[in-house]
């Protein structure tokens, strides 16, 4: 089976938990976009493990693959590999030599660019991801393959300084070069042709799971530009981000929260002007710790994401959190400047007048003390109001919700 897990909102949907749950059935798990701006948390028997570069499925899959579509901070990757080795024996990692390298210069540039944007700040994670992708498309990148040569590292850093030095200020090139070279010497055993590895695995009949980072609404082309990430996040970017043919993908799983959250600026039609959901769901970014904006489930966004990713099944997370509210709403459509929209439109002018049409549902209450009973009995034992909510979403999206998450832990999951 060749599967892709993608986020259908603004990231933070719970892809990490779903991927970790699924990965016992897969031989390889692959990251194909983003960098350490993607934070995901896996909870196993109450123990939290947080990754930013290593895919969430690493705890169960045989081989971890980091594709060419990523930009990688070698020092932070080393830290995560050490963390992974403490949690798991016999790890196997393949890192594409074509992946770009995130350096200290990129982090400095990221912060400086945000300062220069002033009131139009995007709200980046300040991890250097955007500037690293800028260099990729400007053909200036240090590649993972380059980390075995101190000369190549220095030459490319000097080139970056020559072109962008006014923004970075003084940087100790020797120190940065030596840090990258040292990290590279430890990582080089893992660096190779990830595309060829995946081709070989496919021909051997291995099961491969591609794990997307961020979400559809943060895609550089299809998201709420300019308040987006710097890479393509939709399922189709599996091919360009890993070198694996998308025609071989059999299964696209769209993951979404039972409500909507967003970090940073930009349009958010169903946003709620209270802290109730944030507090109930502990909605703070894994990478930055920033409070997430919260709102009701947005069906126009989910319809748009389902179409973009061609999802064939869905996974819903945090239903246990949503039930703690006294009343629950779902945004079913928009009226924008007098025109009706059931799907998120190609463009929304920031000055437009937006009205959201809502469907209201009765709560199913706080189920925290009853979750273990539901897990043992299956979908039909879930509260009636919760099942009504799930089935309304299925009917609205014309797609089955096969995976239902009722908590952070891997075990707190029901498969229909």
From Swiss-Prot:
Any one cellular-component term (Gene Ontology): cytoplasm
Residues annotated as binding IMP: 12-15, 37-40, 125, 139, 214, 229, 290
InterPro entries named in the record: Adenylosuccin_syn_GTP-bd, Adenylosuccin_syn_Lys_AS, Adenylosuccinate_synth_dom1, Adenylosuccinate_synth_dom2, Adenylosuccinate_synth_dom3, Adenylosuccinate_synthetase, P-loop_NTPase
Binding annotation for Mg(2+): 12, 39
Active site annotation, chain numbering: 12, 40
Reactions mediated catalytically: IMP + L-aspartate + GTP = N(6)-(1,2-dicarboxyethyl)-AMP + GDP + phosphate + 2 H(+)
NCBIfam families: PRK01117.1, purA
Stored HAMAP family: Adenylosucc_synth
Name recorded for this polypeptide: Adenylosuccinate synthetase
Species name: Picrophilus torridus (strain ATCC 700027 / DSM 9790 / JCM 10055 / NBRC 100828 / KAW 2/3)
Gene giving rise to this polypeptide: purA
């Amino acid at each position: 089976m060749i599967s892709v897990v993608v986020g259908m909102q603004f990231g933070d949907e719970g892809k990490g938990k779903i991927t970790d749950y699924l990965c016992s059935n897969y031989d390889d798990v692959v990251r194909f976009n983003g960098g350490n701006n993607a934070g995901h948390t896996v909870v196993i028997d109450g123990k939290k493990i947080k990754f930013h570069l290593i895919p969430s499925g690493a705890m169960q899959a045989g081989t971890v693959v980091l594709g060419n579509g990523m930009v990688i901070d070698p020092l932070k990757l080393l830290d995560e590999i050490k963390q992974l080795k403490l949690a798991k024996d016999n790890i196997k990692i393949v890192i594409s030599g074509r992946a770009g390298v995130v350096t200290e210069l990129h982090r400095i540039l990221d912060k400086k660019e945000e300062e220069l944007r002033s009131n139009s700040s995007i709200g980046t994670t300040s991890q250097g991801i955007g500037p690293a992708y800028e260099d990729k498309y400007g053909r200036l990148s240090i590649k993972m393959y380059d980390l075995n040569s101190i000369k190549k590292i220095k030459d490319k850093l000097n080139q970056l300084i020559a072109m962008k030095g006014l923004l970075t200020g003084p940087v100790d090139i020797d120190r940065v070069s030596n840090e990258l070279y040292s990290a590279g010497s430890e990582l080089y055993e893992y660096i190779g042709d990830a595309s060829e590895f995946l081709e070989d695995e496919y021909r051997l009949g291995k099961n491969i799971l591609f794990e997307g980072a961020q979400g559809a609404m943060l895609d550089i082309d299809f998201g709420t530009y300019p308040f987006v990430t710097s890479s393509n996040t939709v399922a189709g970017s599996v091919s360009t981000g890993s070198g694996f043919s998308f025609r071989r993908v059999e299964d696209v799983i769209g993951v979404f929260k039972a409500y909507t959250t967003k970090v940073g600026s930009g349009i958010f039609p169903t946003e709620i002007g209270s802290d109730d959901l944030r507090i109930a769901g502990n909605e703070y970014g894994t990478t930055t710790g920033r409070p997430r904006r919260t709102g009701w489930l947005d069906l126009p966004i989910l319809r748009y994401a389902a179409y973009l990713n061609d999802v064939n099944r869905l996974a819903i997370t945090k239903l246990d959190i949503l039930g703690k509210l006294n009343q629950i709403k779902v945004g079913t459509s928009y009226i924008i400047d007098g025109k009706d929209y059931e799907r998120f439109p190609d463009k929304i002018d920031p000055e437009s007048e937006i009205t959201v049409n809502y469907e209201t549902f009765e709560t199913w209450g706080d189920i925290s003390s009853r979750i273990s009973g539901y897990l043992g009995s299956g979908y039909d034992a879930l509260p009636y109001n919760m099942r009504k909510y799930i089935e309304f979403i299925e009917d609205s999206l014309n797609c089955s919700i096969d995976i239902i998450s009722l908590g952070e832990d891997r075990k707190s999951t029901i498969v229909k």
